[in-house]
């Protein structure tokens, strides 16, 4: 729910990245065209870069979406880290997805997770297993045969073992025709994309491929995740909330378990004792330190800044040290440098997501990769090589390598599609909110748009989710599509967003729809004042918290000709015990029967009579993040009041719409709704109209 950035320390990085983003659009015959909805299925998503032990190759995933087949599929690819077009080769075959690529320590194998038929008895419904592929050729073979499947894994440093994350299983259910009933005893009993939660937990196992031996090394009524091998292979660090009531707090700590223990983890050693969440452990090369992500003020739940900390791995070695208190920016994915003297991590800062580096002493913070970009992930090689997945407004994520302080492009996955497109121009903006607070955002202008040439364009305020997230310099397909349709698209990072410090983020604590409303409206006013936006042709919308803030907007103003509220909340007390935010609701708003006035005052539903804006409402019927009952309630009220409205519910979809035809349908409905009410052109949906 949160993301990252930092100051422009390495200003020189702006030039090579921007040049790569534009120069990669090598022309084909014919004039460039505008982006369309169908380009969503032509563009591919690159992910999970992993550098080989000899630093010569980078393995990664490429995800494609097939509209006709109604599925997405991820395949493993490999490219020479030195770069060069034509060097990328696929490692896995079409027909089944592969994820979580890892190199075996000797560099011979690329392993991955996949749910494929293995040929074993009872394999009619294959579970996710660890597979291995000899990079020199041949077919992939399964390493594991775990009946319930594997959720995550990591190789031991010597390559002789793997640590697996495996979920418990139920005893056999006696009925073959009726599903097992859910018997709930937990405080937290739902999770989006999972459904009802039971008492089954994830634990760590050590698997030895040579003997097929599988040994459980943790147990108990706790979830154990994020395993990381100590460099000598003797122990494993992991994250787990082992408090008396794990569902009633965020007290995840770092623990260490001996890799060859035979007592199922009864003799664990707790490394951190912070009352808030500690996670993402990473070992120093000498095994003396563990770097991890921590929260200093856990009572602020998701508004608290994620910090980088280190702790001695040996008991009695000293207290944890928080290295980034003065940075005050959310960060993630710490990794030690090969010499152990510094730690690399991702950091959100003012609409960027950079790769940062800080010494183990907490001194000399720098940004090896920074600028008008969004680093989605990165990998370090044993020789210090760094590969990063970088997106820009003109290019979805591709893999780059860091070389002598500059980034060089390694993969060119989407060049053939991008070469024929005319994309929107993107400008970062800064303006004061109503109380004088400085707010930042981005403005997308249609291809060929000239500011100051009358008339200004119809404009759409699109609000990000979270609320603890930020718009960045990443490629944004939705914004590019709307701009191609002739709209100026306004993105604002209002208070509550990450990337601007904890005080900025916590400013909306128990006060949603107030300061953040002022901030997004100030972004609209700024676009109007500077000649981008036509004040008489405005639309608004968003998904998740973007939809929630949209609900506040349309209860407070009639300036917008159209609104789209997706997967939003509206009557907050009705969500208590129904969505998966039990703990967060109580921390921020208190118990609804004890603090009823606040719950009611914040709920946009109680101002529904003020809404006059034509509003399209959307959601998935299996969403346990922000349940569809919310948009159903708002739809019912607007229909009763005689307001122009429609409700679209996507079958079988969670908070994230995944079915390709529904993704297409949603975008087409966006365009049709805005065209009809903002442009007044009578837009229609050509997709799945029922």
Language-model segments: what does each one mean?
Residues 491-690:
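Active-site-proximal cap/loop segments of hydrolase catalytic domains
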Residues 50, 163-165, 172, 181-184, ...:
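Non-catalytic accessory segments flanking enzyme active sites
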């Amino acid at each position: 729910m949160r993301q990252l950035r930092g100051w422009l320390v390495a200003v020189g990085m702006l030039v090579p990245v921007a040049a790569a983003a534009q120069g990669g659009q090598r022309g084909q015959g014919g004039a460039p065209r505008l982006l369309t909805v169908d380009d969503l299925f032509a563009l591919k998503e690159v992910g999970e870069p992993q550098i080989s032990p000899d630093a010569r190759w980078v393995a990664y995933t490429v995800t494609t979406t097939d509209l006709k087949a109604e599925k997405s599929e991820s395949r493993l690819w490999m490219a020479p880290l030195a770069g060069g077009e034509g060097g990328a080769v696929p490692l896995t075959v079409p027909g089944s997805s592969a994820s979580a690529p890892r190199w075996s320590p000797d560099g011979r194998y690329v392993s991955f997770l996949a749910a494929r038929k293995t040929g074993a008895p009872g394999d009619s419904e294959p579970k996710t297993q660890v597979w291995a592929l000899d990079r020199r050729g041949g077919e992939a073979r399964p390493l594991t045969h775990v009946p319930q499947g594997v959720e995550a894994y990591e190789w031991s440093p010597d390559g002789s073992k793997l640590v697996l994350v495996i979920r418990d299983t139920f005893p056999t259910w006696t009925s073959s025709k009726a599903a097992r009933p859910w018997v709930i005893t937990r405080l937290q009993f739902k999770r989006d994309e999972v459904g009802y939660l039971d008492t089954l937990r994830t634990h760590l196992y050590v698997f030895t491929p040579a003997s097929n031996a599988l040994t459980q090394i943790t147990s108990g009524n706790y979830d154990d995740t994020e395993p990381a091998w100590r460099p000598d292979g003797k122990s494993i660090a992991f994250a787990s909330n082992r408090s008396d009531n794990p569902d009633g707090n965020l007290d995840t700590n770092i623990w260490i378990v001996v890799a060859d223990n035979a007592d199922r983890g009864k003799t664990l050693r707790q490394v951190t004792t912070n009352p808030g969440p500690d996670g993402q452990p990473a070992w120093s090369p000498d095994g003396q330190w563990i770097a991890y992500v921590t929260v200093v003020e856990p009572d602020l739940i998701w508004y608290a800044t994620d910090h980088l900390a280190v702790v001695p791995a040996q008991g009695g070695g000293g207290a944890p040290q928080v290295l980034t208190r003065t940075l005050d920016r959310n960060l993630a994915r710490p990794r030690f440098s090969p010499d152990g003297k510094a730690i690399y991590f991702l950091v959100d800062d003012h609409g960027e997501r950079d790769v940062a580096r800080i010494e183990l002493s907490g001194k000399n913070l720098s940004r090896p990769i920074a600028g008008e970009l969004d680093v989605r992930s990165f990998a370090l090689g044993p020789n210090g090589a760094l590969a990063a997945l970088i997106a820009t407004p003109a290019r979805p994520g591709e893999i780059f390598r860091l070389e002598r302080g500059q980034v060089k492009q390694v993969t060119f996955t989407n060049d053939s599609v991008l070469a024929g497109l005319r994309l929107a121009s993107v400008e970062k903006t800064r303006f004061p909110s109503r109380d004088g607070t400085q707010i930042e955002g981005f403005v997308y202008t249609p291809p060929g748009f000239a500011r100051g040439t009358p008339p200004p364009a119809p404009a759409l305020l699109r609000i990000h989710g979270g609320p603890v997230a930020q718009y960045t310099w990443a490629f944004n397909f939705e914004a590019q599509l709307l701009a191609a349709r002739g709209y100026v698209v306004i993105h604002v990072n209002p208070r509550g967003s990450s990337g601007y410090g904890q005080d900025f983020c916590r400013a909306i604590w128990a006060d949603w729809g107030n300061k953040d409303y002022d901030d997004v409206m100030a972004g609209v006013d700024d676009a109007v004042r500077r000649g981008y936006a036509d004040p008489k042709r405005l639309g608004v919308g968003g998904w998740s918290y973007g939809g929630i803030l949209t609900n506040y907007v349309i209860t407070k103003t009639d300036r917008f000709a159209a609104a789209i509220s997706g997967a939003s909340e509206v009557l907050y007390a009705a969500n208590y015990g129904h969505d998966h935010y039990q703990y967060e609701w109580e921390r921020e708003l208190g118990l609804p029967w004890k603090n009823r006035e606040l719950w009611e005052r914040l709920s946009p539903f109680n101002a529904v009579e003020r809404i006059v804006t034509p509003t399209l409402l959307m959601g998935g019927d299996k969403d346990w993040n922000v349940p569809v009952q919310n948009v159903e309630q708002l739809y019912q009220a607007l229909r009763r009041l005689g307001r122009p409205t429609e409700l679209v519910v996507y079958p079988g979809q969670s908070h994230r719409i995944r079915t390709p035809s529904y993704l297409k349908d949603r975008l087409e409905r966006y365009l049709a709704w805005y065209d009809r009410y903002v442009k007044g052109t009578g837009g229609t949906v050509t997709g799945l109209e029922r």
